Amino acid sequence: MSGWPRIYYKLLNLPLSILVKSKSIPAEPAQELGLDTSRPIMYVLPYNSKADLLTLRAQCLAHDLPDPLEPLEIDGALLPRYVFIHGGPRVFTYYTPKEESVKLFHDYLDLHRSNPALDVQMVPVSVMFGRAPGREKGEDNPPLRMLNGVQKFFAISWLGRDSFVRFSPSVSLRRMADEHGTDKIIAQKLARVARMHFARQRLAAVGPRLPARQDLFNKLLASKVIARAVEDEARSKKISHEKAQQNAIALMEEIAANFSYEMIRLTDRILGFTWNRLYQGINVHNAERVRQLAHDGHEIVYVPCHRSHMDYLLLSYVLYHQGLVPPHIAAGINLNFWPAGPIFRRLGAFFIRRTFKGNKLYSTVFREYLGELFSRGYSVEYFVEGGRSRTGRLLDPKTGTLSMTIQAMLRGGTRPITLVPIYIGYEHVMEVGTYAKELRGATKEKESLPQMLKGLSKLRNLGQGYVNFGEPMPLMTYLNQHVPEWRESIDPIEAIRPAWLTPTVNSIAADLMVRINNAGAANAMNLCCTALLASRQRSLTREQLTEQLDCYLDLMRNVPYSTDSTVPAASAGELIAHALQMNKFEVEKDTIGDIIILPREQAVLMTYYRNNIAHMLIMPSLMAAIITQHRRISRDALQQHVEALYPMLKAELFLRWEREELASVIDALASEMQRQGLITLQDDELHINPAHSRTLQLLAAGARETLQRYAITFWLLSANPSINRSTLEKESRTVAQRLSVLHGINAPEFFDKAVFSSLVLTLRDEGYISDTGDAEPAETMKIYQMLADLITSDVRLTIESATQGE
């Protein structure tokens, strides 16, 4: 580029460099989209805009991509490196020819015909200044749509710092030429497909237009389902129809979001400023699969795990910066206090009560509102656990909202609904101290402005944050596979509850929990906490801690928990240095070296972070515990031990493997443990390697408390085979509390009611407990003897004496 065009672009770039601060989606386009910079790259933009072109250029130069203003020279021909699909509007409307883009596509394709070695990468790029969807009434032309020069100037002036450059996966023109030819008809088809691509991308970025809130309420009131519920309300409560209708409107006011793009923009600025000061980084993985779902027109339901109140803001912030529409979020009614409630409502929150029981009108209004969100095409987010995890483990799912999601499908008319499980991880959770108090029996504090300000005042260095998108679950595909007759239940008016609904919802919920855990994120804090809590004195030398982290990292890297889980790329030493900056540990120096200590008052709190990745290490920990206690064991015996205990572990930690997969998992982990020198293989027997016995013992300690808990319940069941489930749960907790006091077990979940409730249900499902009294006590005693061999003799004596003394 030379002469007047260079001067023109330089002059135009002066105001843009001041007004525009764009972000790239994805953050590293060359790496994440697999662009090969050694091969020719050309860019395709939706419509003619020099401002868009220069904004793209700034991002290309920042990410070491070819300059779009520098032409491509191929076989002596000079071609522009960018193509505008549409001429774009002007201040005065007139016909703008589209032939130029078709001609350029044809020129590029023709070069591929004459040069078989040529392969140009065509990269679609859209530049967005603002992403307001507009209202259903009022705005004819939301800012993202094609703007003429004057409109563009004002859009850039107002929205220049809320701009995104969205790179899409490249298209190989070589493949296009080989498969479809190089004539002008193919070039026209390519331009047409590109236009459709950009139209879909706009919808994915901004979402459908927003309704006026009152119009939405009027539509809901006019629905036959709510009209019938209003009549039932009037009849059952002996009130007038008008009063019952006012009750319905009041419930809509309580529930409904009041989405505001301006509030999104303002919050984005505040959160961007806040995250940069509180977090050292927010790590996002597998976002491209969600962008593709949005592009393909799926109705997306985000289903994250729930660690903290921060989840609401973090996930919306991440999605916005991934070029996706922030979802409508189901938030607990406890958050509907001033000023948080009105703010959350404008950020897309709709509020849900803890229980729907005894209020048919409320459940009907909520279900119809949720169905309306789906039918209008808004993405939705809800926490399937129902509340924040106090232990750091996934809670058993609450299936009410998920059931309503499937009922919305049974009304017909919605786009394909896809559930997206999300793992959210932190190196510091601001509520973790409160969680520990609640697990010890303290009453949960009601959310309020003073409590919120108190929490915010304590925010300091929060380390790293992690948002991992798991494997999506297309509901239609799932139902086609598991309930082929589901379409027979479609009813556009009534909320149907077919016989298959409850078991199917339970199965989907369990699958979602497994997929959330599959996307787990190991980090410096949870790895260091796992190692230090494994030590009985909660302290290790720096060398021992480094060796233990190396063991964990090698296990996770060489035998990954799943393809969606993430492990830090940093070394053990770097992770320890980072964890020490979080000020959770103490370092005691002596003449020999450093000792890293987890203080007693921090130990209970740090179990939360250990539990975040307990599922990722439980299998090697269990194997290490079995090998350590037996000193040597055959592969077959090891597998028998693991298979006997696996159903309880799978249910408690939502593990991913089926029973028939265990043999290959055990073999892979045993091979890795042998490679690390933790064990040796002699005559098909696994032996402890004395040189690395400490590392193996610390690895085994990860399963220690779980095995002790199982031993308690199996001993009680062995001692009293006719015990009922409720009593078994209660007595198991009592013994666990006694054990924790006598043996210094600092994990609050050790005697958590939910953990024992889940265990007892699994024992019933596995046949160890029977409501009809036909359980097999001999099998129960056999499992107890196996567990008794895996725990220390003093713990075993405490368990057995607890029942003997009663």
Curated annotation (Swiss-Prot):
Is Nucleotidyltransferase set as a keyword in this record?
Answer: no
Molecular-function GO term, any one: glycerol-3-phosphate O-acyltransferase activity
| Keywords for this protein | Acyltransferase, Cell inner membrane, Cell membrane, Lipid biosynthesis, Lipid metabolism, Membrane, Phospholipid biosynthesis, Phospholipid metabolism, Transferase
**This enzyme's EC code(s):** 2.3.1.15
Reaction(s) the record says it catalyses:
sn-glycerol 3-phosphate + an acyl-CoA = a 1-acyl-sn-glycero-3-phosphate + CoA
What the entry lists under CDD domains is as follows:
LPLAT_DHAPAT-like
Record carries keyword Methyltransferase: no
Pfam families linked to this entry: Acyltransferase (PF01553), GPAT_C (PF19277)
- Localized where? Cell inner membrane
Its pathway, per UniProt, is: Phospholipid metabolism; CDP-diacylglycerol biosynthesis; CDP-diacylglycerol from sn-glycerol 3-phosphate: step 1/3
Q: Which InterPro entries match?
A: GPAT/DHAPAT, GPAT/DHAPAT_C, GPAT/DHAPAT_LPLAT, GPAT_PlsB, Plipid/glycerol_acylTrfase
Just give the chief location class: membrane
Q: Where is this motif: HXXXXD motif?
A: 305-310
The protein's topology relative to the membrane is: Peripheral membrane protein
* Gene Ontology process terms (BP): CDP-diacylglycerol biosynthetic process; fatty acid metabolic process
Superkingdom to which the source organism belongs: Bacteria
List cellular component terms (GO).
plasma membrane
Tell me which family the UniProt entry assigns to this protein: Belongs to the GPAT/DAPAT family.
In the record's own words, the domains note is: The HXXXXD motif is essential for acyltransferase activity and may constitute the binding site for the phosphate moiety of the glycerol-3-phosphate.
Q: Any idea what this protein is called?
A: Glycerol-3-phosphate acyltransferase
* Native source organism of the sequence: Salmonella schwarzengrund (strain CVM19633)
| Native organism taxonomy | Bacteria, Pseudomonadati, Pseudomonadota, Gammaproteobacteria, Enterobacterales
Q: Which gene encodes it?
A: plsB
